[in-house]
Amino acid sequence: MHLTDNKKHTLKKGDFVISLCGHDKGSIFVVLDTEQNYVIVCDGKNRKSDKRKRKKFSHVRFLNLHTDVIDKVPSYAVDANVRREIKRLKAELAQE
């Protein structure tokens, strides 16, 4: 897996992260936005773009991968495209 240290990377919209803490530990998310000490994420399934999850930077790990799907699709299609991108990423990681 392509894990990096969050302290060396500034998370931005479209980055893939994996949850390190909480009931969603091990889940893959896409970054929608960042706040002062928090990252706003969604997975398109349990946490949709309209019910975003707020996680501390220290509770996620950057996967060194990025998607432009957030900016390229209309807002009503974000969740379906996020699910598709996460599914594709999981398939790639399973092959490694």
Which stretches of residues belong to each language-model region?
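Ferredoxin-like alpha/beta domains used as RNA- or RNAP-binding modules
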Residues: M1-K13, L20-C21, V30-E96
